[in-house]
């Protein structure tokens, strides 16, 4: 499972990989490709990345002006194209307004830093969103994964797991340390899927 960040230099100030790079990654290592679109126009780019190997595409609600109808339509289109779909919320975006579309989500990604750059400090108050998502999943009998991205390290991952995260995205911490040791030395950590973010 590989978490693949896509940044357009507009929605977030950084600029990263395009669909051709994803296609190359998929050919070289046929892992499950979790593509996180940090772009101004996810309606345009989601189909392009699916065509080039994305197994799951998540996009920011803010990029669609937090419009529930547009978000629902894009999730439907992603599913129509044969991929899994998910939504992402920035730290300042409430999750509660999107309760009605949770049934269409395969994944909900909570950003625990401002998106765009690695190495930022974990925002612990974002775990309140995780707790809410876990409770709603149980109440509504849904099956979406709860993912968190930003500031995950040897201390914060335990907080994320305790709050209810299924999937942790780690970038800077993984690549600045011994990957094998980090991923497999802690039983609580290795029991969960950690996705290595290509920075």
Predicted features by range, described:
Residues 3, 34, 58, 86-88, ...:
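Structural detector of well-ordered beta-strand residues that form the stable sheet scaffold
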Residues 3-77:
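N-terminal active-site wall of soluble small-molecule enzyme domains
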Residues 5, 49, 108, 133, ...:
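Conserved, mostly hydrophobic/aromatic
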Residues 7-9, 38-42, 62-64, 90-92, ...:
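Active-site beta-loop-alpha junctions enriched in small/polar residues
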Residues 18-25, 45, 70-77, 97-101, ...:
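A general structural detector for well-ordered alpha-helical segments in enzyme core domains, enriched
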Residues 28, 44-45, 54-145:
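Conserved anion-binding
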Residues 43-51, 93-105, 150-168:
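Catalytic cores of alpha/beta
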Residues 57-65, 109-120, 163-183, 192:
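Glycine-rich phosphate-binding active-site loops on the catalytic face of alpha/beta enzymes
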């Amino acid at each position: 499972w590989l978490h693949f960040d896509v940044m357009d230099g507009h929605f977030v100030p950084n600029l990263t990989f395009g669909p051709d790079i994803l296609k190359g990654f998929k050919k070289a290592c046929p892992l499950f490709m979790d593509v996180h679109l940090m772009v101004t126009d996810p309606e345009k780019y989601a189909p392009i990345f699916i065509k080039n190997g994305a197994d799951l595409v998540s996009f920011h609600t803010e990029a669609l002006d937090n419009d529930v109808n547009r978000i629902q339509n894009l999730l439907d289109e992603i599913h129509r194209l044969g991929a899994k779909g998910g939504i992402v919320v920035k730290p300042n975006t409430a999750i509660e307004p999107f309760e009605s579309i949770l049934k269409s989500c395969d994944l909900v990604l909570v950003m625990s830093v401002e998106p765009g750059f690695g190495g930022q400090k974990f925002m612990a108050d974002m775990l309140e969103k995780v707790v809410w998502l876990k409770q709603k999943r149980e109440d509504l009998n849904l099956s979406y994964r709860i993912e968190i991205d930003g500031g995950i390290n040897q201390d914060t991952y335990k907080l994320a797991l305790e709050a209810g995260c299924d999937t942790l995205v780690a970038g800077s911490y993984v690549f600045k340390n011994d990957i094998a040791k980090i991923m497999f030395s802690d039983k609580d950590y290795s029991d969960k899927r950690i996705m290595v973010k290509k920075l």
